[in-house]
Amino acid sequence: MGQASIQRRAGRPRRTATAAVRASQPVCHLCGLPVDLTLQRTGRGKHPLSSCIDEIIPVIRGGSITDPANLGHAHSVCNN
């Protein structure tokens, strides 16, 4: 099992880091516009401006998914 597989199963530490990033970073780190936390999934998937968490340094390149310093708050559309 690779490092990416192991880290993706981080569970609670990942959720804790994600919650911290959403609370402390109210703007998209990619475009600089505010992220509306009330936008949720629609019947056909995510709203384009809904919240997602982006790995600044991908796990495959040694980044951590449990370190808030490596996570950025983004719009779904900006992160794709």
Segments (PLM) and residue ranges:
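Short, intrinsically disordered, charge-balanced linker/junction segments flanking boundaries
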Residues: 78-80
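Cys/His/Pro-rich metal-binding microdomains
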Residues: 29, 72, 76
